[in-house]
């Protein structure tokens, strides 16, 4: 039987100004869908897998073809409905409505488990969309680099007086998300030892300059770390091995990294985490033949892995969960103190979320890197006092290789996002940019996610699991005129542990686009300030007052 999810073909987004669709409002989602499956972007594009275990862009190749065909004929007064990667309907709406509405892997809470999802998945009734895979705004590993960089910089401020020179970070996983860690560490001034079981991933990170060296043994990797830290150099090494073996071995040897984290795809025990003692080939085969055996072995390995992280924490090493739900699995497997160390959001990122600051991103539909460099310059011009951001943009230009369509990630917040969006739109109108840009973000943002073991862990008022907020965020983005809006379940941390929404808006240089951009790029981050103000965070309350937000049940205005 032919696998409907496997097809040996290369997909790449069109570039330039010639349209395949009826307008830029439908050309934009078409190109970004294709960009998600570019061989330089996606992890397993022939299987429709973009990143994060089995995060897909479309349910089957037949569905992909139908989405493409529909987008090419969709008018500016129609909206395409996509249900878990399948184009199920086209409806008459209006010009300011989203052109595409997407819902991925959403399940009624009682049934929101991997077992139930996998059953639906096998029947062809569902698709795991991760966060930006099924919402068509993945830009490669750059998409998470700045967030990781901000985390490491803040950890350096809190624990090492703001100086990571001569320090090293231990982590695991070099997939679509984890691959950001070594480069982010180096940008923050630290060395990094990243453990990865799949050599092809290490090689890919070497090729795209996200990692500096490769090692086959722990001793070889440690020798490089020792050499670099003593010389005060910031460099990274990808060690081919299993984190469930390497982390405990380092504990056994009494070796103390300066920061410990992990970004293996532990959120998906079957497809995302190699059990200790298994080869990659054996693992891939048993995912099909005996998935339950894989799950049992992977979960047992995660317990060992997290136990080692707790050991590092108890040694006084700053240790953080980077949002893959590995602590939850370890606790379910009997490790009572699995949550001894914190997640990265409550430890380092929440003050940014309180001001609506998060992973704003844009991609140049022209395909020309110069369009991105021009927008980089515009960001500096409009935000002249944000030297930290200027430093990031300079490092990004120097170190980050574009994957697929040229793109940029840039953490900015309420009051700045709409300003940048309007400026980019004017650059398209004037011809300074060769073609329109799309502006979006990760679902990991201040007002668009409920994830009690990650973004909303340890909320001040105990509202960690309240998922009204991402639903309201999606609804408001629809009402505001985003070009496409998505609502997903299970991204980052797996089934049953998160709900989250995304939006993308196209800046095509028109007056209509300007009006939509101003609404969307103000309202979207404002929901994050609202959510954190409602939880009682003073930073968010002050920001809401400063920006003049009308929050009757919170500010009484």
From Swiss-Prot:
The keyword Lyase applies. SUPFAM superfamilies: Urocanase. Its cofactor is NAD(+). GO terms for cellular component: cytoplasm. The active site is at residue 410. Binds 1 NAD(+) per subunit. Keywords: Cytoplasm, Histidine metabolism, Lyase, NAD. Its main location: cytoplasm. One of its GO terms (biological process) is L-histidine catabolic process to glutamate and formate. Catalyzes the conversion of urocanate to 4-imidazolone-5-propionate. Belongs to the urocanase family. This is Urocanate hydratase. The gene is hutU.
